C-alpha cells in the first residue's frame, strides 16, 4: 500500500517468518522500491536514516508489547523525521513511549524516567521544540470480548 506511493519503503522486522512473508509479498506485487531487513530496529534504524538522509521521511512504528527500545526513542528524537505513526498493543508502554516522545518524561542520571522540569509553566497542549506532538490518537478494538486493544497515534515533530 505505502510502497506504491513512496520512493522507497523499508521494513525492519525481527521475526524471520514475517520478514520472509514481506519478501514474498514484495515479489508478488513487483515492489522494487521495498527493502525488508530482518533484525532489531535498534540495530538497523540509524543505517536506514543515514542512507535516506535529506529525503522526506515518514515512519510507521509497531513495537512489541514491551514498547519502543530507549535507543530507538533517542534515535527518533535526534532524527529529522517530521511525522510518525505509532501502533501499540499495550496502553501502559504506549503512555510511557508517548511521554518520552513528547518530552514530558526524561531519563535522569540513574536511568529512571521522571517528569521533565522544562514543562513546568508550559501551557497545556504546548510541545517543546525537538519533541513530537500528538495529532491524533485512536484506539481499535480488534479483539472483541478481550482486554486487548490496538492504538494508532499520529505524531508530528515540533
Question: What is the predicted role of each segment?
Answer:
Residues 1-158:
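Rossmann-like S-adenosyl-L-methionine
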